[in-house]
């Protein structure tokens, strides 16, 4: 008794099961056909049985044949109920009848009867009724012709039926069968994928059959996209084979260098045989032998997996070639937009509708994900997990700082840490079908899920300690073998830079596929390098110039002496055991590195313009950068995201040491926020499942869904709107970027908004304004956004719940998007969403620091500019937008917008006065402040008879 009491203090109570057991029980008891519950793609009639599209297609075909039945046979069958009752059990128990009857025609279990009650149409109005309805069973279509047994093929005939007659008939059929037995077993071949006869089927028909029987569309589209990125079956197989050979070479050559050479004999030996260790593998240490066997088993497993994937790659090749019409030679040059267009064409060519199926199966077919498969849906499926990670990085929910006293402000996000985050968080939140577990969408299990996530972080940190040494050794050897020769030939490449993994996740937008993001980022590299070189490093340049001069002079003298007498001088030792060739290599490398630090003499320094060009491609510009693009603080922050390759590699190596500490101390503190994040930023889309709320674009509302906040007083912002919004305009930039990639021209973006790529010039070109004429940063941003048609770099926060923190930029001048053939009708962008955007706010957003006088004091002269009058009343955005749309229409400019607010009295003419009065009456409803002001001005006009000023 005492022992049990002691153990009960340490062991968990029986009433609190593990969170993993709760998740497994919840997944096991959930109905897989319920999209709201599991968002799955299969429908089970019983344990282990799955409905396929082929069975539904046969059901539809059988329904068509049932209309051709003879009415006399139907009438006779109703006149002999006793005969049917006698023969029924024997046929139902036969094996042949089991194959001929579709599984969807079986009696439904009572546990599923409640699903039909969820339909919008009452059961009394449905043609099919319920599963257990006898009338429905009588109207079920007959089995296919090839499935009918010989007994079923013979129609019933009137006449007496006795046991003797039936016995003689059966004996005659056994002696002389009317139909061969093979014809009765033939249909079983079509229902099984593993039958040998499937190899003789037409490849196009087989590809169509596999497309019709896709159960998990997320996994299928990932295979389609991976095949597209791999450039075909042969390129994928070649890449995998070369990867296996590279792994084997690195492991084998490293083992040879560390265990098979006696380095003590190198100095006095003259051949390789003198320093080789005979039978070195038998003399290896126990740890080296264990590691070698472990890597060998891993290599064998990868090779076996590569062999198994050949069949799957062949199926994907047939899908591309026969259904999409894309060969392996064309897949390297075709665009992804064209692939999406052909997928939508294939979807539209194979409708999955039927009129002779039950309500439950119609509901299943209506929720098939293949009906929701345009560019927006495909991107959401492919990036279902990545969109959440983009939002996590954007909202700074993950604490990635190093838990070290002198490095607490340093963020570390490497590929190793990214892999651990996917393992601990994504695999915990998502189930096997790739959907968010509904358990995370309920706040009742918040504490248990948070504790489970903490334990996963701690366990992953412990596992990293055991795995890190092996990974460090492999990556160091691989990096050395790959880049040493490149650095030896071109030493200046040591200083080459690259975006860090954290920068890539900061720059990547929602629903932006990897190849589109990679293309956009690659185009920014020349401008990023130019920006980093823009800052004059006067002290560094002077020292580097001196070092380059000295090293170059010494290398020149040695090279000249070698040319004069090469045979004598090349073997000449300058120091002990150091010849001229050695010092030529040393001085040449020092000169190359120092010369690379010295900029060209003709370089024009303009860091603001260079960074603006970078922002045009990265779409990343925090709000605190505004007005400070020339500062050294912004440069240091940008260089943290754009570091040298050698530094990134060292961080990857060091991250294998520091990752366990981040997993132990930092990330467990974020577990509560992570659980809340997935619960609060997950929405359900019919036919697709659960998605990140930021990745579901509202095309109908356009940019009007993003409200503009008061930039003058950030303290007045709604905290709830701040919480439910993205930082730095991420959602709006993603929206515009998506429309740019999948615009009206599906082979590229719209020609009007597409910007051609040019390498960065050494100085501002004719198309680039000089430094003296570029004006303030606000004007330059306005010019950049107008020229490129992209979302402004300083977009602040936007939310679907409330006003944003900072004013949006780049919206007023953005053209209304044209309809796209890559989007379904419910995803077509609405021009009204762009028409309603207030352009007065676009004029105001860069001049918000100027105080706005009250309305009572806005008495302007007649020659005042329309823009100034357009900014006279920022307190009425609704009336401003309405006035702009009524007077200027869709394409009105800022000057027209200002005119729409003016009450022209004499000089503008009677027509303008009448139109302006009618528009204001329509807006203000004939009363209110605007109506009183208009009446007051008309009274002044009639009484004084002279020109009044505009409002």
Swiss-Prot record:
<feature type="intramembrane region">
    <location>
        <begin position="457"/>
        <end position="477"/>
    </location>
</feature>
<comment type="function">
    <text>Phospholipid scramblase involved in autophagy and cytoplasm to vacuole transport (Cvt) vesicle formation. Cycles between the preautophagosomal structure/phagophore assembly site (PAS) and the cytoplasmic vesicle pool and supplies membrane for the growing autophagosome. Lipid scramblase activity plays a key role in preautophagosomal structure/phagophore assembly by distributing the phospholipids that arrive through atg2 from the cytoplasmic to the luminal leaflet of the bilayer, thereby driving autophagosomal membrane expansion. Required for mitophagy.</text>
</comment>
<dbReference type="GO" id="GO:0005776">
    <property type="term" value="C:autophagosome"/>
</dbReference>
<dbReference type="GO" id="GO:0017128">
    <property type="term" value="F:phospholipid scramblase activity"/>
</dbReference>
<feature type="topological domain" description="Lumenal">
    <location>
        <begin position="262"/>
        <end position="289"/>
    </location>
</feature>
<feature type="compositionally biased region" description="Basic and acidic residues">
    <location>
        <begin position="171"/>
        <end position="180"/>
    </location>
</feature>
<keyword id="KW-0968">Cytoplasmic vesicle</keyword>
<feature type="transmembrane region" description="Helical">
    <location>
        <begin position="579"/>
        <end position="599"/>
    </location>
</feature>
<feature type="compositionally biased region" description="Basic and acidic residues">
    <location>
        <begin position="23"/>
        <end position="39"/>
    </location>
</feature>
<feature type="compositionally biased region" description="Basic and acidic residues">
    <location>
        <begin position="104"/>
        <end position="114"/>
    </location>
</feature>
<dbReference type="GO" id="GO:0034727">
    <property type="term" value="P:piecemeal microautophagy of the nucleus"/>
</dbReference>
<keyword id="KW-1133">Transmembrane helix</keyword>
<keyword id="KW-0445">Lipid transport</keyword>
<dbReference type="GO" id="GO:0061709">
    <property type="term" value="P:reticulophagy"/>
</dbReference>
<feature type="topological domain" description="Cytoplasmic">
    <location>
        <begin position="600"/>
        <end position="645"/>
    </location>
</feature>
<dbReference type="GO" id="GO:0030659">
    <property type="term" value="C:cytoplasmic vesicle membrane"/>
</dbReference>
<keyword id="KW-0597">Phosphoprotein</keyword>
<keyword id="KW-0472">Membrane</keyword>
<feature type="transmembrane region" description="Helical">
    <location>
        <begin position="290"/>
        <end position="310"/>
    </location>
</feature>
<feature type="intramembrane region">
    <location>
        <begin position="646"/>
        <end position="666"/>
    </location>
</feature>
<keyword id="KW-0072">Autophagy</keyword>
<dbReference type="GO" id="GO:0000407">
    <property type="term" value="C:phagophore assembly site"/>
</dbReference>
<feature type="topological domain" description="Cytoplasmic">
    <location>
        <begin position="667"/>
        <end position="951"/>
    </location>
</feature>
<feature type="region of interest" description="Disordered">
    <location>
        <begin position="72"/>
        <end position="186"/>
    </location>
</feature>
<feature type="transmembrane region" description="Helical">
    <location>
        <begin position="241"/>
        <end position="261"/>
    </location>
</feature>
<dbReference type="GO" id="GO:0061908">
    <property type="term" value="C:phagophore"/>
</dbReference>
<feature type="region of interest" description="Disordered">
    <location>
        <begin position="810"/>
        <end position="919"/>
    </location>
</feature>
<dbReference type="GO" id="GO:0005789">
    <property type="term" value="C:endoplasmic reticulum membrane"/>
</dbReference>
<feature type="compositionally biased region" description="Basic residues">
    <location>
        <begin position="93"/>
        <end position="103"/>
    </location>
</feature>
<comment type="similarity">
    <text>Belongs to the ATG9 family.</text>
</comment>
<comment type="subunit">
    <text>Homotrimer; forms a homotrimer with a central pore that forms a path between the two membrane leaflets.</text>
</comment>
<keyword id="KW-0812">Transmembrane</keyword>
<dbReference type="Pfam" id="PF04109">
    <property type="entry name" value="ATG9"/>
</dbReference>
<keyword id="KW-0333">Golgi apparatus</keyword>
<keyword id="KW-0256">Endoplasmic reticulum</keyword>
<feature type="region of interest" description="Disordered">
    <location>
        <begin position="1"/>
        <end position="54"/>
    </location>
</feature>
<feature type="compositionally biased region" description="Basic and acidic residues">
    <location>
        <begin position="128"/>
        <end position="138"/>
    </location>
</feature>
<dbReference type="GO" id="GO:0034045">
    <property type="term" value="C:phagophore assembly site membrane"/>
</dbReference>
<dbReference type="GO" id="GO:0034497">
    <property type="term" value="P:protein localization to phagophore assembly site"/>
</dbReference>
<dbReference type="GO" id="GO:0000139">
    <property type="term" value="C:Golgi membrane"/>
</dbReference>
<protein>
    <recommendedName>
        <fullName>Autophagy-related protein 9</fullName>
    </recommendedName>
</protein>
<feature type="topological domain" description="Cytoplasmic">
    <location>
        <begin position="1"/>
        <end position="240"/>
    </location>
</feature>
């Amino acid at each position: 008794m005492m022992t049990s009491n002691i153990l009960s203090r340490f062991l968990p109570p029986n009433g609190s099961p593990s969170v993993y057991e709760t998740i497994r029980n919840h997944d096991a008891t959930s109905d897989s056909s319920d999209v709201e519950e599991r968002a799955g793609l299969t429908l089970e009639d019983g344990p282990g049985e799955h409905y396929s599209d082929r069975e539904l297609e046969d059901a539809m075909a059988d329904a068509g044949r049932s209309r051709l039945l003879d009415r006399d046979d139907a009438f006779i069958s109703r006149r002999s109920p006793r005969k049917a009752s006698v023969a029924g059990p024997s046929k139902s128990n036969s094996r042949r009848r089991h194959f001929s009857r579709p599984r969807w025609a079986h009696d439904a279990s009572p546990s599923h009867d409640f699903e039909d009650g969820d339909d919008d149409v009452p059961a009394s109005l449905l043609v099919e009724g319920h599963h257990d309805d006898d009338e429905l069973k009588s109207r079920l279509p007959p089995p296919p012709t090839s499935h009918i047994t010989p007994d079923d093929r013979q129609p019933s005939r009137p006449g007496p039926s006795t046991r003797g007659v039936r016995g003689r008939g059966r004996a005659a059929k056994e002696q002389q069968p009317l139909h061969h037995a093979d014809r009765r077993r033939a249909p079983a071949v079509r229902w099984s994928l593993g039958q040998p006869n499937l190899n003789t089927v037409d490849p196009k028909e087989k590809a169509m059959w596999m497309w019709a029987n896709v159960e998990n569309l997320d996994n299928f589209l990932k295979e389609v996209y991976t095949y597209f990125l791999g450039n075909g079956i042969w390129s994928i197989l070649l890449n995998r084979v070369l990867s296996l050979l590279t792994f084997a070479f690195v492991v084998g050559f490293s083992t040879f260098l560390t265990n098979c050479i006696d380095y003590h004999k190198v100095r006095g030996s003259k051949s390789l045989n003198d320093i080789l260790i005979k039978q070195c593998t038998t003399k290896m240490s126990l740890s080296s032998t264990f590691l070698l066997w472990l890597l060998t088993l891993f290599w064998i497993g990868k090779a076996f997996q590569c062999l198994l994937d050949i069949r799957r790659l062949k199926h994907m090749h047939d899908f591309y070639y026969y259904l999409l019409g894309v060969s392996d030679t064309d897949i390297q040059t075709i665009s992804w937009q064209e692939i999406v267009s052909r997928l939508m064409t294939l979807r539209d060519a194979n409708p999955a509708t039927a009129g002779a199926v039950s309500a439950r199966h119609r509901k299943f077919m209506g929720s098939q994900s293949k009906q929701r498969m345009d560019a927006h849906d495909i991107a959401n499926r492919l990036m279902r997990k990545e969109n959440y990670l983009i939002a996590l990085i954007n909202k700074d929910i993950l604490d990635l700082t190093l838990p070290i006293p002198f490095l607490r402000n340093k963020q570390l996000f490497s590929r190793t840490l990214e892999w651990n985050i996917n393992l601990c968080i994504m695999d915990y939140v998502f189930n096997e079908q790739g959907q968010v577990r509904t358990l995370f969408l309920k706040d009742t299990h918040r504490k248990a899920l948070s504790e489970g996530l903490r334990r996963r972080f701690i366990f992953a940190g412990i596992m990293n300690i055991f795995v890190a040494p092996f990974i460090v050794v492999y990556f160091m050897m691989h990096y050395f073998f790959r880049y040493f020769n490149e650095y030896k030939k071109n030493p200046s490449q040591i200083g080459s830079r690259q975006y860090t993994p954290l920068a890539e996740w900061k720059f990547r937008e929602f629903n932006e596929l990897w190849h589109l993001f990679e293309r956009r980022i690659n185009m920014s590299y020349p401008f990023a390098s130019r920006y980093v070189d823009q800052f004059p490093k006067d002290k560094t340049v002077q020292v580097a110039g001196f070092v380059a001069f000295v090293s170059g002079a010494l290398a020149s003298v040695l090279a000249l002496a070698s040319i004069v007498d090469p045979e004598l001088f090349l073997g000449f030792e300058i120091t002990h055991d150091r010849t001229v060739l050695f010092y030529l290599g040393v001085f040449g490398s020092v000169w190359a590195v120092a010369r690379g630090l010295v900029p060209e003499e003709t370089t024009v320094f303009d860091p603001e313009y260079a960074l603006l060009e970078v922002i045009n491609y990265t779409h990343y510009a925090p709000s605190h950068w505004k007005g400070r693009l020339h500062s050294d603080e912004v440069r240091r922050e940008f260089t943290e995201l754009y570091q040298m390759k050698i530094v990134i590699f060292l961080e990857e190596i060091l991250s294998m040491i520091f990752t366990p500490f981040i997993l132990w101390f930092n990330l467990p503190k974020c577990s509560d926020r992570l659980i809340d994040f997935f619960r609060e930023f997950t929405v359900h889309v019919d036919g697709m499942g659960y998605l990140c709320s930021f990745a579901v674009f509202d095309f109908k509302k356009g940019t009007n869904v993003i409200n503009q906040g008061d930039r003058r007083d950030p303290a007045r912002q709604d905290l709830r709107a701040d919480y439910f919004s993205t930082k730095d305009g991420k959602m709006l930039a993603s929206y515009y970027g998506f429309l740019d990639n999948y615009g009206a021209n599906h082979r590229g973006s719209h020609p009007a908004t597409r910007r051609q790529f040019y390498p960065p010039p050494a100085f501002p070109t004719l198309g680039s304004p000089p430094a003296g004429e570029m004006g303030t940063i606000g004007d330059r941003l306005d010019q950049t956004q107008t020229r490129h048609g992209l979302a402004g770099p300083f977009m602040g926060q936007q939310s679907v719940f409330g006003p944003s923190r900072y004013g949006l930029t780049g919206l007023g001048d953005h053209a209304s998007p044209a309809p796209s053939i890559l989007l379904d009708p419910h995803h077509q962008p609405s021009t009204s969403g762009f028409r309603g955007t207030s352009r007065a706010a676009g004029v105001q957003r860069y001049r918000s620091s100027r105080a706005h006088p009250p309305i009572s004091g806005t008495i302007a002269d007649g020659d005042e500019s329309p823009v100034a009058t357009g900014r006279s009343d920022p307190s009425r955005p609704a009336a401003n937008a309405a006035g702009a749309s009524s007077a200027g229409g869709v394409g009105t400019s800022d000057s027209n917008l200002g005119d729409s607010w003016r009450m022209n009295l004499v000089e503008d003419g009677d027509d303008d006065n009448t139109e302006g009065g009618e528009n204001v009456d329509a807006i203000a409803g004939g009363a209110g402040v605007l109506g009183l002001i208009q009446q007051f001005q008309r009274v002044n006009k009639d009484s004084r008879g002279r020109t009044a000023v505009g409002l």
